């Protein structure tokens, strides 16, 4: 890697958190931890059985807050990159955990929401949420109190902060996708957007994604190994450029 990059955009999917013990959605059978997606990740599922949906996310939240779930070397490397790069690093994540924050990243866009927040469906106001959400927990920020729900973007709902995402992609000179399947849009199209704006594109995954042909460079292996390796290459290129300019 020869060029020093100034505006790095990272897209992360379930693969980066899987190595930390967070189970992923299995697209081949439509199940998430043995639950049908239609039951636990749609507005209709929440309307049908709010108790079951709330408990599903309560269990995920408890696990995330347990000592068993920790950021892995890939999260830590991205935190280091943001701290040491002489430029900007934007992490766009499809994950709902807080492992990027705990790994040291600060400029994070949670396009699918956050497990450690709850949202009022009437006002869209969000609050920090580390305790269980129960059926009957009402929001009192609006005139008509509504049942609080997990701050999660369910299937059929619009991803969050799309304007900020596209603005970052327009500025990117390096776009890296880590642990994504490439089948969920609009995220699967980000590599095309970044490439059209001139960014170098890299895919890091266990196996080729559905959009692997869009990437100029592919690195296949564990995120915990490949991401730290890439970060060191980026920072080394920056150091060489600084030395040559001195």
Curated annotation (Swiss-Prot):
What is the annotated localization of this protein? Answer: Cytoplasm
Q: Which InterPro entries match?
A: DHS-like_NAD/FAD-binding_dom, NAD-dep_sirtuin_deacylases, Sirtuin, Sirtuin_cat_small_dom_sf, Sirtuin_class_III, Ssirtuin_cat_dom
Bound how, and how many: what does the cofactor note say? Binds 1 zinc ion per subunit.
- Give residue ranges for domain Deacetylase sirtuin-type: 1-237
Cofactor (UniProt): Zn(2+)
The reaction(s) catalysed by this protein are:
N(6)-acetyl-L-lysyl-[protein] + NAD(+) + H2O = 2''-O-acetyl-ADP-D-ribose + nicotinamide + L-lysyl-[protein]; N(6)-succinyl-L-lysyl-[protein] + NAD(+) + H2O = 2''-O-succinyl-ADP-D-ribose + nicotinamide + L-lysyl-[protein]
The enzyme's E.C. designation: 2.3.1.286
Q: What class of enzyme is it?
A: transferase
**What are the GO MF terms of this UniProt record?**
histone deacetylase activity, NAD-dependent; NAD+ binding; protein-malonyllysine demalonylase activity; protein-succinyllysine desuccinylase activity; zinc ion binding
GO CC list = cytoplasm
Domain of life, per the record?
Answer: Bacteria
Keywords from the named record: Cytoplasm, Metal-binding, NAD, Transferase, Zinc
The record's listing under HAMAP family reads: Sirtuin_ClassIII
Its function, per the record, reads: NAD-dependent lysine deacetylase and desuccinylase that specifically removes acetyl and succinyl groups on target proteins. Modulates the activities of several proteins which are inactive in their acylated form.
According to UniProt, the name of this protein is NAD-dependent protein deacylase
Native source species: Vibrio cholerae serotype O1 (strain ATCC 39315 / El Tor Inaba N16961)
């Amino acid at each position: 890697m020869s060029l020093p990059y100034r505006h790095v955009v990272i897209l992360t999917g379930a693969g980066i958190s899987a190595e930390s013990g967070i189970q992923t959605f299995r697209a081949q059978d439509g199940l998430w931890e043995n639950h049908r997606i239609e039951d636990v990740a749609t507005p209709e599922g929440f309307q049908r059985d709010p108790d079951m949906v709330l408990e599903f996310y309560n269990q995920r939240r408890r696990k995330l807050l347990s000592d068993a779930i920790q950021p892995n070397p890939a999260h830590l490397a991205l935190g280091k990159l943001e701290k040491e790069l002489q430029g900007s690093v934007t992490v766009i994540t499809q994950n709902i955990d807080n492992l990027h924050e705990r790994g040291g990243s600060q400029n994070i866009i949670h396009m699918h929401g956050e497990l450690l927040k709850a949202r009022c469906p009437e006002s869209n106001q969000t609050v920090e949420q580390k305790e269980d959400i129960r059926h009957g927990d009402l929001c009192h920020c609006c005139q008509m109190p509504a049942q609080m729900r997990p701050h999660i973007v369910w299937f059929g709902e619009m991803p969050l902060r799309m304007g900020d995402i596209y603005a970052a992609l327009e500025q990117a000179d390096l776009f890296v996708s880590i642990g994504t399947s490439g089948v969920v849009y609009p995220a699967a199209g980000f590599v095309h957007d970044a490439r059209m704006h001139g960014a170098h594109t890299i895919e890091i995954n266990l196996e080729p994604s559905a959009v692997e042909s869009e990437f100029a460079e592919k690195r296949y292996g564990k995120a915990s190994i490949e991401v730290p390796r890439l970060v060191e290459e980026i920072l080394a290129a920056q150091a060489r450029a600084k030395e040559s300019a001195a």
